[in-house]
Amino acid sequence: MLRAASRAVGRAAVRSAQRSGTSVGRPLAMSRPPPPRAASGAPLRPATVLGTMEMGRRMDASASAASVRAFLERGHSELDTAFMYCDGQSENILGGLGLGLGSGDCTVKIATKANPWEGKSLKPDSIRSQLETSLKRLQCPRVDLFYLHAPDHSTPVEETLRACHQLHQEGKFVELGLSNYASWEVAEICTLCKSNGWILPTVYQGMYNATTRQVEAELLPCLRHFGLRFYAYNPLAGGLLTGKYKYEDKDGKQPVGRFFGNNWAETYRNRFWKEHHFEAIALVEKALQTTYGTNAPRMTSAALRWMYHHSQLQGTRGDAVILGMSSLEQLEQNLAATEEGPLEPAVVEAFDQAWNMVAHECPNYFR
């Protein structure tokens, strides 16, 4: 049961404070709870996945353990990491929580990714090396979901897919996922896998939020056609949709965050830090005040409620939102927002207007 899992995480947090190393926890016998359902007659809302990119960077082992525990205690069960996150520290921390990840009776699901960056590739040897290294860090025999983090345009995709099929046959992962691929590449991959009898991808992880909707035009119809679930990352545009930033902030010294003080900061600024984007956020904030008055929800809450109630995500198809965090407090606030109801029509319309303001400079969902 997830309560047992969260207790195991709590014990791991205590251990991490007592010593610098991590220890292997005994696999936990847990039965998966039914997914949370909306009120009678309402559509099933998308699932929530915990993004762990900040574990090992802005969150140490103890804070990470507390966040995983809080996530599990709210009835969620999917964790998302990657080979490259914090140079492997994200996976190491998750592996030390004693969850029994990858065991047959563990209902806490774990996903990781292999990438073609920083000397890596999606050639067979590199894919195998990355996945097997991830399994060692996570202290598990297999992962539930194994993504190709982005296309490797220097490697024939057939080589990559054949290698993935071999690893799947060896029992090293359950489901295959894609991330940051163009819709035509998804169609090509699904066709190749089907014609060769290789494992088919079943999940796509992509960039999607209230002011970044490029996936709606072509990618989502492609995924529906081939039967892939869609997991949305950057639901708050890297934190821009919290409303806490001003456009002029880029010119001064800022605290470490998604947009400042890390190796990916420039990528995130190029992706979202546009003057029109800040104007669009101001428009939504004005609509919130006009519509709700003194009871207006925070911008963060409104952006997440848009994802769960007004986006093109479909809970009945297994779609999900990936929630990252840099602190336990932030996670708890965001989880609370995911449980709130739909927005008033005037605010939904304001989000649509905001999207129209920034659509011309929307970052590509593919790489």
UniProtKB/Swiss-Prot annotation:
Residues 1-31 have a biased composition (Low complexity). One of its GO terms (biological process) is lipid metabolic process. Expressed in liver, kidney, testis and brain with low levels in skeletal muscle, spleen, heart and lung. Keywords: Acetylation, Cytoplasm, Golgi apparatus, Lipid metabolism, Mitochondrion, NADP, Oxidoreductase, Phosphoprotein, Transit peptide. The modification N6-acetyllysine is found at residue 136. It holds the Pfam family Aldo_ket_red. Residues 1-46 form a transit peptide. It catalyses: 4-hydroxybutanoate + NADP(+) = succinate semialdehyde + NADPH + H(+). The active site is at residue 85. Its main location: mitochondrion. The record marks 113 as: Lowers pKa of active site Tyr. It is found in: Mitochondrion; Golgi apparatus; Cytoplasm. The modification N6-succinyllysine is found at residue 244. GO terms for cellular component: Golgi apparatus; mitochondrion; nuclear envelope. Residues 1-45 are annotated as: Disordered. The modification Phosphoserine is found at residue 40. NADP(+) binds at residues 80, 179-180, 205, 234-244, 258, 326-334. PANTHER family: NAD(P)-LINKED OXIDOREDUCTASE SUPERFAMILY PROTEIN (PTHR43364:SF4), NADH-SPECIFIC METHYLGLYOXAL REDUCTASE-RELATED (PTHR43364). Belongs to the aldo/keto reductase family. Aldo/keto reductase 2 subfamily. Catalyzes the NADPH-dependent reduction of succinic semialdehyde to gamma-hydroxybutyrate. May have an important role in producing the neuromodulator gamma-hydroxybutyrate (GHB). Has broad substrate specificity. Can reduce the dialdehyde protein-binding form of aflatoxin B1 (AFB1) to the non-binding AFB1 dialcohol. May be involved in protection of liver against the toxic and carcinogenic effects of AFB1, a potent hepatocarcinogen. Homodimer. This is Aflatoxin B1 aldehyde reductase member 2. The gene is Akr7a2.
